[in-house]
């Protein structure tokens, strides 16, 4: 009886059918977890590291004090800062450039900044139409910070207990 049973099992592919049933149970009849990307967005953490931005104080003055710590700590050497001394003795940046092709979005610049001037936003989809747009200058970074200031402030407040 055993040889006949083995012959019928191999002839009818019962092992194959059992494997296909298991595959169908786990693949076909499960709910899909894929997102339709342009229409649906995955939720992002307040610590998400996206596009860089420069922040301002509530009175409109830029926060950057030109200490150049972010430039020194950047492992990719993507940040370039030039500064000058003002009449009141404080330093301010005349040039603040970030090469977006070099930047690895590690967040070291954000961590090293003593006045929370440079921050990483939640913006994850950005593009450039020309190669010379890869360098984000001070005006572009300040505009990005102005645009997302409410979200940046909320993210900083949510992350405050862990800093």
Swiss-Prot record:
[4Fe-4S] cluster 1 binds at residues 64, 67, 70, 113. Binds 2 [4Fe-4S] clusters per subunit. [4Fe-4S] cluster 2 binds at residues 74, 103, 106, 109. Keywords: 4Fe-4S, Cell inner membrane, Cell membrane, Iron, Iron-sulfur, Membrane, Metal-binding, NAD, Quinone, Repeat, Translocase, Ubiquinone. One of its GO terms (cellular component) is plasma membrane. PANTHER family: NADH DEHYDROGENASE [UBIQUINONE] IRON-SULFUR PROTEIN 8, MITOCHONDRIAL, NADH DEHYDROGENASE UBIQUINONE IRON-SULFUR PROTEIN 8, MITOCHONDRIAL. NDH-1 is composed of 14 different subunits. Subunits NuoA, H, J, K, L, M, N constitute the membrane sector of the complex. Belongs to the complex I 23 kDa subunit family. NDH-1 shuttles electrons from NADH, via FMN and iron-sulfur (Fe-S) centers, to quinones in the respiratory chain. The immediate electron acceptor for the enzyme in this species is believed to be ubiquinone. Couples the redox reaction to proton translocation (for every two electrons transferred, four hydrogen ions are translocated across the cytoplasmic membrane), and thus conserves the redox energy in a proton gradient. This is NADH-quinone oxidoreductase subunit I. It comes from Halorhodospira halophila (strain DSM 244 / SL1) (Ectothiorhodospira halophila (strain DSM 244 / SL1)).
